[in-house]
Amino acid sequence: MQYDERYTPYIEMTGLLPFIQLVSRSTPNLNVAAVTALIDRWRPETHSFHLRTGEMIVTLQDVSMITALPIEGKPLCMSTDSEGWRQQMEALIGMPPPEPEVEDGGKKDRVPADAPFTWIAANFAHCPEDSNDEVIQTYARVYMWYVISRTIFADGTGKNAPWMWLKALTVFDNKFSWGSAALAYLYRQLDDACRRSTKDGGVGGCMLLLSIWSWERLPVGRPKTSKWNTWDDNGNPVRLPTWAYKWDVVSEVASKVNLLYKQYTNKMDSLTAEQVEWQPYCAGPNFGDAHTFELNPICL
């Protein structure tokens, strides 16, 4: 799904523009072994990572600095009731995904209220050039739905976009606290992952947020920054880079995941307080790593 500049005013109304600007570019590679070693130290009883140095958590400050998602506003509380969701989706974006085929004599399983990412991309990847404002709004809405379902509210499978996140975008100017929702969702996904409550044992939530939080604070699995691609803010302060730009392009992990996991686990076990960066978001040598760039004002 390619970003279209015609979507910008509608995305900006939702408060998602800085984050969309961030993830619409190439994001740094995920170090699976390092993330797994970190998740192993998550405890659902306290919703925190238990390390030798003490307990650590991802906070709303981290959400704001790394993603620039709004942390103030109305709580994003969406009903999970899926009755009539196909009709509602058709009214909102013009069509629902096709119903799954059932073989003759087969039992029709309960269909989840979501749409495959492949279906979304096949039908809404490109907004026609001669589209009127209403059509552009529809494509912008679907684009945001696609992006946040793959990033903020990823479920670990990478297959479907839940209907409730599209429903949350019915009105653009709802002033939702997307940052609070992102953090709560990440906590829940970490709870599920450390309990291995899903069939695949995977993890969802905003892995970009978790990865950069870890790189900023812990030396375990921290990559080297190789370069910074040009950032085009189009003269709009809201589109300036977030703190995540420090890690725009990082070195790739070359070793085998299983071997790295053991190494990272041992490093986590021996981590000292002196090795932890307790206050990463401050002026000074850390900030200069990104060649001194103007930070998005929403992060401050």
Where in the sequence are the language-model features?
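Structural stabilizers in ordered domains
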Residues: 1-300
